[in-house]
Amino acid sequence: IKQETSGTVTVEGSRYKLMYLGAEQLFDGEKTYTVVPENEEITISSPEEGEDFGINPSKLLNFYKEGYDYQWDIKQNVLGRTIQFVKLIPSDENKEVSYLLLGIDVLKKSIYRLIEIGANGTRTTLTLSNQLTNISLATDYFKFDASSYPNYYINN
């Protein structure tokens, strides 16, 4: 099975706004708001102390610093860019992930691609096709406004 989807994410510190598969997820630093327009539903949740809070784009760029052993892998030319892959092997053998391949753009020194190989052989690829840095955002960009969603069911 091959399936491709795209989305956008904006990250500032620990706060983020993710738009993916028709839904929006917003983390304002304290709570996560997941808006699903198809169902007209909003779920609001708070992370517990020390909890890994599921998808967290703000951790995407440094998740590998703990819990993985790593080694150099292949270097590829991708669309004129030199991408150096690093193989990340989970320290915990009971993980559902066999290994990850983290592709680094050598010139930009940024993550270009993340490939996850599951213990069951499933392959998931995330490609960061465009990254903008040091952009100005409105002060309320990461603020949830319930009035923008009239008639939505809000699940606390």
Kindly give the residue locations of the regions a language model identified.
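An N-terminal domain-cap segment
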Residues: 1-3
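An acidic-aromatic
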Residues: 6-54, 124-125
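Short, surface-exposed charged micro-motifs
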Residues: 6-8, 23-24, 69, 99-103
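Short, functionally important structural connectors and interaction interfaces within domains
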Residues: 19, 52-56, 62, 96, ...
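Residue-level preference for alpha-helix termini and adjacent loops
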Residues: 26, 41, 54, 59-63, ...
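Short secondary-structure transition/capping segments
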Residues: 28-40, 63-76, 117-124
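Flexible, surface-exposed loop/linker segments and immediately adjacent secondary-structure boundaries
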Residues: 47-82
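Gly/Pro-enriched, hydrophobic low-complexity segments
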Residues: 71-154
